Amino acid sequence: MLFSYQRSLPRQPVPSVQDTVRKDFDWTSGVAQEFLKLQASLLQWYLQLKSWWASNYVSDWWEEFVYLRSRNSLMVNSNYYLMDFLYVTPTPVQAARAGNAVHALLLYRHRLDRQEILPTLLMGMRPLCSAQYEKIFNTTRIPGVHRDHIRHLRDSRHVAVFHRGRFFRVGTHSQSRLLSPRALEQQFQRILDDPSPACPHEEHLAALTAAPRDTWAQVRRSLKTQAQEALEAVEGAAFFVSLDSEPAGLTREDPAASLDAYAHALLAGRGHDRWFDKSFSLIVFSNGKLGLSVEHSWADCPISGHMWEFTLATECFQLGYSADGHCKGHPDPSLPQPQRLHWDLPDKIHLSISLALRAAKTLSGNIECHVFPFSRFGKSFIKRCHLSSDSFIQTTLQLAHFRDRGQFCLTYESTMTRLFLEGRTETVRSCTREACNFVRAMEDKEKTDAQCLALFRLAVDKHQALLKAAMSGQGVDRHLFALYVVSQFLHLQSPFLDQVHSEQWQLATSQIPVQQIHLFDVHNYPDYVSPGGGFGPADDHGYGVSYMFMGDDVITFHISSNKSSTRTVRLTHPGPSSLGTPASLPSCSSGFQTPSSPPARDPGVPVLKPHSPQAQGQGPQPSCFSASGSPSPSFSCT
């Protein structure tokens, strides 16, 4: 009988968890040892050869395989954003803010072209590589079916502008001279006053730049044939400007929700009002608030952050505004009207635009952004504890994530390798054994404060050691990545490298650099601080976390996750408990208290100063990259 033995068969036993873990560890160790014996020497030899003739053994491959060969949408998945001053809006006049900001950006480009920007020095001594500055302006990422490429022009004398579904070309120079801020304001105001409607499908055309790269590449071929002049005007612009029809920024009525909406508008917008291929897009909201959307392949956050600090300081403190909120100076009635770009869109592109718009709206609607200023303590308190501020935050993030998920995860923190020629970034794996020991101790009621503090300091010291190793070229992940690329070129299968390559970063983190240049004293003008910026999660069920130290007493966090994930809910509403817990340990706070007074401005109470003396140019005048204007940069970067 077929089933005659069914009742006599034993049940399958559950193996010992110790045996299973040991066997898995033995297998992993065996795979690593096999890699060292059979393949590592050959792959390393090829890397050494490359290091002799290439300026950097890994950076070009990192740009190509991580960015340019990725077929995912740039929106959310790659591009990141930077915010305006948090508490201050120098003018509510949209065209005026755009005029000053564009003029300041082009002043930065002028100094860049003349090499008047001083190299950044680490600790005032070690120069950092400046190669990434070359592609800030006049740069576009061109889509390809299998691989994108970066197109960089030596010069461009116009910007591309988007407003209410229409595209314009605005010249930035007249008789070889940069237009004044007031003249630029005049041009932007002409666009705002233009009543002409968008042509059919023109309004949503930019959604194609948010589509998967192979899809956009195929559509672009038809677009280049039918609308070459308009496409060239956008892709050949110095940068892209979006004049949004909605306000943004911190509001008194609902500060938390308004900041979240501000971040979302910069990261994704409406899916069709940003040209995501441009090196960066300047976004000017209807109430005068600014923001930046940055394409990631050409450079990392410290580069765009350096430019953004200069722009905000220059347009506010050096250029300034008149008493009525307009740019200083006089309009130029002789300037021609901004050129409206016309797109001859063939019928076969219409469906592609509609599909791209639908996908962009789905992606935009799925991303959740939260921004919150943490004001219980800041960098000065951490420094008085004789701890690294970045390591402090990274360790407490492990505690916050464990309290959210009940488990640890592979954590990615990016740090710069610009101490070396054409260096970009390296990964610090922040979820260390020491960090896990600290977190377990914090969750163990039997552990004393002294024991927890000792473990906390061990975790911070371990992270600091990993950070220094990564910055000095002794990191792990970029080397493994380069070995993996060589193995693919040689068609060598490596279970060890395949396993490393498939790892998922459920917690992607980065510190946003701040005060890379000193154009004004932030201590004298504490309201004139930017909360930094953020980026999307690296994993469908993970978080993207960036943070920035605003002055001495506030830390701003930007947290992103996907609404479609049921596992990413609580960390986006973390509250101060996990962050404040280490600071409450007795020896950490002994001898001084966390700030009892509020920060320079309560994050819940915005103060708009459209006509403040500083906004009118009566504040400190920037020294514009004096010798003392290159302080030590922050160690981390996106």
Predicted regions and their residues:
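Long, Pro/Ser/Thr-rich low-complexity/intrinsically disordered regulatory tracts in eukaryotic proteins
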Residues: 1-278, 287-288, 295-613, 619-638
